[in-house]
Amino acid sequence: MDQDGFHSIAWDDAPSSNPPLSAPSPSQSPFEEGFESISPSSAQPPASDQYEGYDNSKAGEAGDVGVTLDRRERLGGHEVDGSVWNGKWMDVQVREPAKEHEGSKDMYVSYAVKTETSLPTFRKPLTVVRRRFQDFVFLREHLVKNFPACVVPPIPDKHRLEYIKGDRFSPEFVERRRLDLQRFADRIARHPVLQRSQLVNDFLQSTEWSVAKHHHISHPPPESHASLIDSLSDTFINAFSRVRKPDARFVEMTEELERFEEGLTGVERVVGRGKSRVDDLAADYQDMAAAYQGLGYLESGITEPLNRFAEKMLDFSTLLKHMNNTTIEPFLSSSHSLLSYSATHRNVIKLRDQKQLDFEELSAYLSAIVSERDRLAALSSGHTAAPVGLGTYLRDQMDKLRGTDDIHTRRERMRKMDGKIKELQDAVTLAHETSNAFSEEVIKEHAYFELEKKQEMKDALQAYTDGQVEMLQQAMDDWDRIIPLLQRIRVDV
């Protein structure tokens, strides 16, 4: 267990009692052991009909995925259906925040992390450990390093303002952070690759977490083989470089994510404005209740009905505030978190584009070196060389002026170019295989993200709807009880 891999995991022997988690299931990818361990020449084992975390009966073959804009093919050969995403067989709960070393300068908040799972990689079906916020940060940072092709869920921000004001131990801030960490844990638990990571395994059940962290730091996954691309990337690849032949699948993925973010941002803006208006309305009802209480003191004959009416107004004001805190605020927090998750997915697609750009630029560089080598060979044999660029022409003229443009110099340059061409050919082959492997993994990651997005949107909208219905039902019941009392009021004119 020196690296964050899954060599000891039996993918095809899941217990039959485990509920299946349906998701796309192409043949096992090298990315399941981290991108560093990609071996393009290694054979891929066949996938079973159904194993833990996947449902192959609903997925198409990996070879069916083509360069097409068809959504079915782009998502790995099947339509994504959130109703089949059944990830409850691994449940992680972040709860019971507690202050540690209270009163000292080293005080921090720890959270109880309870895990229930039937995964065979866990020693116990139920474990409870305590982790602090920095432990979650450590987990995400190292998952990103070990699985660069995976969409690792974002971690909540540190909220610097609360650190400056000293409010990071307030109950409101701690609860808000706990909910954010709960979303992070849920996404990790439902991800069919990340939840099998050895680091996640240690995080969720190790009682010696500090030892496990140091062990993981001291035994990182093996680095990828050094290649020419590392030394040349800074030379000809920069922030302004663009992929010459964009893959239609990933172009549409990016556009789809951007449309989703734009739509969700609009919804978030509208709901946020509604929240502000509800706050204003609650304050108005509170002021009106005070006015009716004052009127009740003036009208001695109907003091009790007016006071009861004022109390119901206060109750309704409290009900509106309660709805904002328990329904609208969680919906806004959930939508903001989902926007961050989508942005993380887009960053992974950008990284895939960078892999393709590396391949394209290396190929172009190899072509230029081969052309120059052929030109020198033609000159050495006495034939007329092909037309050259301005830079090559100026260099040849300078060589002539220095007297270095002779047959021996050309042969030495050709010998060096032969070695560089061989090195570039190996680098181009590796870059091509890496780009293809990364692309296949991103296709699967997009399908996982679609399932997670649909599940989270369903839960958020369900909670939002239930909260609205509960508030309206409670308001109707309260007003129905007070209306008969108001109807019995008789005022002498």
Curated annotation (Swiss-Prot):
Residues 89-211 form the PX domain. It holds the Pfam family PX. It is a peripheral membrane protein. CDD domains: BAR_Atg24p, PX_Atg24p. It comes from the Eukaryota. Residues 37-48 have a biased composition (Low complexity). GO terms for biological process: endocytic recycling; mitophagy; piecemeal microautophagy of the nucleus; protein transport; reticulophagy. It is found in: Cytoplasm, Cytosol; Preautophagosomal structure membrane; Endosome membrane. Gene3D superfamilies: Arfaptin homology (AH) domain/BAR domain, Phox-like domain. Residues 1-67 are annotated as: Disordered. InterPro entries: AH/BAR_dom_sf, PX_dom, PX_dom_sf. Its main location: cytoplasm. Sorting nexin, involved in the separation or division of vacuoles throughout the entire life cycle of the cells. Involved in retrieval of late-Golgi SNAREs from post-Golgi endosomes to the trans-Golgi network, for cytoplasm to vacuole transport (Cvt), and autophagy of large cargos including mitophagy, pexophagy and glycophagy. The PX domain binds phosphatidylinositol 3-phosphate which is necessary for peripheral membrane localization to the perivacuolar punctate structures. This is Sorting nexin-4. It comes from Cryptococcus neoformans var. neoformans serotype D (strain JEC21 / ATCC MYA-565) (Filobasidiella neoformans).
